[in-house]
UniProtKB/Swiss-Prot annotation:
Name of the protein described by the UniProt record: V-type proton ATPase subunit C
Function: Subunit of the V1 complex of vacuolar(H+)-ATPase (V-ATPase), a multisubunit enzyme composed of a peripheral complex (V1) that hydrolyzes ATP and a membrane integral complex (V0) that translocates protons. V-ATPase is responsible for acidifying and maintaining the pH of intracellular compartments. Subunit C is necessary for the assembly of the catalytic sector of the enzyme and is likely to have a specific function in its catalytic activity. Reversibly leaves the enzyme after glucose depletion, causing the catalytic subcomplex V1 to detach from the V0 section.
Single GO BP term: vacuolar acidification
Gene that specifies this protein: vma5
InterPro entries given in the database record: ATPase_V1-cplx_csu, Vac_ATP_synth_c_sf
Self-association state and partner proteins as the record states: V-ATPase is a heteromultimeric enzyme composed of a peripheral catalytic V1 complex (components A to H) attached to an integral membrane V0 proton pore complex (components: a, c, c', c'', d, e, f and VOA1).
Record-level Gene Ontology MF annotations: ATP hydrolysis activity; proton-transporting ATPase activity, rotational mechanism
Family according to the record: Belongs to the V-ATPase C subunit family.
CDD domains for the chain: V-ATPase_C
Length: 394
């Protein structure tokens, strides 16, 4: 799935409602069979506790930082889901559900969850809680991802030991009791994986690689498409020298000590590693789905706070604004913005909130305070926030 960002627009109500603004946006951006947007819906913003202008400005700055933090955290959660699901051949959309809805369905029917985010709290208290929860979800899923990666790495190593070539795979299923020297104080076995193209050279030279190599002791144990496995009997006191010379000759030494029951032990370890990897994967994906859903909900609630604070700073008190959320069609963003700028140009010429803010510092007017904010690099006469779709694209 690849979609454009969601846009949340807030403008003065002038006696209208969110539904009326939806109708306005549809008239503006949908013309006959040509539509610049794929969906538009009311974005209901409840009334929050409003403090002084100084506090609102501080909250605006803090919300901007928290919005960026939350977007980054959710994007990382999303990346973990996509990377993990791709390796498990799952259906991505199942992990990007929000309260059993797609992100589009959730934002299009957004309603403030007052049982989760209590309205008797201040804006800062609510935003702090949302941010803390989302960052906690990110940290938790990173920890679970690390645990899964460790389990997966352990299982892959086990697989390599069972299915690799003779220079890598376990020898427990290859070496038998009759292939090794038992109970000798002087003799030991050295196991060597010899490249196929060097086998003749090895057989002609192994007895002279070092002193005290038992003549004609080389025994072929197995062969694959790349290597042939031999065991050679040498005296223990020259084993290290023999190993060094063998490596210099481009042979691969296999460190192995025969033990009764080793084959069964390794098979049990392999089975345990497979079960653990599967369990950790299931746990990671289950938690990732929860983490995305809960974090996305929190993020949209944070966007709601952003809309409220910026609308009051822009349009004044008491709160009297309407807001909608819509999704531009691909490559139509510039055209939509120009249409909105034309439609709401009067807001730049005659700011609504100049004389409506009450209980603020009388030494600083709203215009001066807003000038200090530098909220956006590009000034817009209306309040506009985006919900970047990259965090839930799949």
């Amino acid at each position: 799935m690849s979609k454009s960002d969601f846009w949340i627009l807030s403008v003065p109500s002038r006696g209208g409602s969110n539904a009326d603004l939806c109708d306005d946006i549809e008239r503006l951006l949908v013309s006959g069979s040509t539509s610049l947007i794929s969906t538009v819906a009311p974005f209901d913003v409840p009334p929050f506790k409003v403090e002084s202008l100084d506090v609102l400005i501080s909250q605006s700055e803090q919300l901007t930082k928290q919005d960026a933090q939350c977007a980054s955290a959710i994007s990382k959660i999303s990346d973990i889901i996509k990377n993990t699901v791709s390796s498990s051949s799952g259906d991505l959309k199942d992990y990007f559900m929000v309260q059993d809805k797609s992100p589009l369905e959730y934002v299009s029917s957004f309603a403030w969850n007052s049982s989760r985010f209590h309205m008797n709290k201040t804006i800062s208290e609510i935003s702090d809680r949302i941010t803390s929860e989302i960052i906690s979800f990110e940290n938790d899923i990173r920890t679970r991802q690390t645990s899964f990666q460790q389990a997966s790495s352990a299982f892959q190593n086990m697989q390599k030991k069972q299915s690799g070539n003779l220079s890598q795979k376990s020898l427990a299923n290859i070496v038998h009791e009759e292939d090794v020297v038992h109970g000798s104080d002087y003799l030991t076995n050295v196991f060597i994986a010899v490249p196929l193209n060097l086998e003749k050279q090895f057989l002609n030279s192994y007895e002279t690689l070092t002193d005290l190599v038992i003549p004609r002791s080389a025994k072929k144990l197995d062969q694959d498409s790349e290597f042939v496995l031999y065991t050679v009997v040498v005296f223990k006191k020259t084993a290290d020298s023999f190993i060094t010379k063998a490596r210099e000759a481009k042979y691969t030494i296999r460190e192995f000590t025969f033990e009764q029951g080793l084959r069964e032990t390794e098979q049990s370890e392999f089975d345990d590693a497979a079960v653990k990897e599967k369990r950790m994967l299931s746990s990671l994906l289950r938690y990732a789905s929860i983490a995305f859903s809960e974090s996305f909900q929190g993020w949209i609630h944070l966007k709601c706070l952003c809309v409220y604070v910026e609308s009051i700073l822009r349009y004044g008190l008491p709160p009297d604004f309407s807001s909608v959320i819509f999704q531009p069609m691909a490559k139509s963003e510039v055209k939509i913005k120009n249409i909105l700028l034309s439609k709401y140009a009067y807001l730049a010429q005659n700011p609504v909130g100049n004389n409506k803010v009450k209980n603020v510092d009388s030494s600083a007017g709203l215009d001066e305070s807003m000038a200090d904010l530098n909220l956006d690099e590009e000034y817009l006469p209306f309040v506009l926030f985006t919900v970047p779709s990259k965090v839930f694209n799949y």
